[in-house]
Design a protein with these regions (language model features):
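Active-site loop segments of alpha/beta catalytic cores
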Residues: 1-158
Length: 158
C-alpha cells in the first residue's frame, strides 16, 4: 500500500464506504472492483465490509494468491494473478504456462477468477511469453465458454 492501513482507514475508507453504498443503492447488482498494488492483506476484510466485490491485481510478489483465495475466496472475485514482475518478463514460455495452469487450478477453483496479468503487459515482456499465456488460457477448460459460465456464477456475475 502507498499509505498505512491506519491512514487508509481514517481518510479513504469512510469516503469509499459512502460512495459504494450510494452506488449500490442505485443498482444493487452493481459489482465494485478495487485496484491497489502491493500488500493489502490488512485491509481486505474492510474492503469486503464496505462492498468491494472484485480485487485487482493480487501481485504474487507481494501476496500469495492461493492464500488470498483461501482466506477471502468466498467473498471476493480476484482479477490478475499472473506475475508481471518476474514470470512474464523474465521467465520462459514453459514457466508462463506452468503459472497460468497453477493459477487456474488454485485461484480458479470454484470460480471467482478473472485470469490476467497483474498489470499491463510491459514492453520488456517477450512476445513468446505473452502468447504462451494467451494460448494456455484459451487452450484450457478455463478458456472455454462452459467454464467461464461456471466461474462467473460464483459471485453472481463476477
Amino acid at each position: 500500500m502507498l499509505i498505512s492501513p491506519a491512514c487508509w482507514r481514517k481518510f479513504l475508507k469512510p469516503r469509499m464506504a459512502t460512495f459504494i453504498s450510494d452506488l449500490k443503492a442505485i443498482n444493487p447488482r452493481l459489482k465494485i472492483a478495487y485496484h491497489s498494488d502491493g500488500v493489502i492483506l490488512p485491509i481486505i476484510p474492510e474492503l469486503i465490509e464496505i462492498g468491494v466485490d472484485v480485487l485487482n491485481p493480487i501481485q504474487p510478489a507481494a501476496m500469495d494468491p492461493a492464500e488470498v483465495k483461501r482466506q477471502f475466496g468466498k467473498q471476493l472475485c480476484f482479477w490478475g494473478t499472473i506475475d508481471e514482475q518476474h514470470t512474464l518478463p523474465f521467465g520462459t514460455p514453459a514457466d508462463v504456462r506452468r503459472e497460468v495452469v497453477a493459477r487456474i487450478n488454485t485461484i480458479g477453483e470454484n470460480g471467482g477468477l478473472i485470469l490476467a496479468p497483474t498489470h499491463h503487459v510491459q514492453q520488456d515482456t517477450p512476445m513468446e511469453n505473452f502468447w504462451a499465456m494467451a494460448q494456455t488460457i484459451t487452450g484450457t477448460p478455463y478458456g472455454s465458454r462452459q467454464y467461464r459460465g461456471h466461474a462467473a456464477g460464483h459471485l453472481s456475475g463476477c
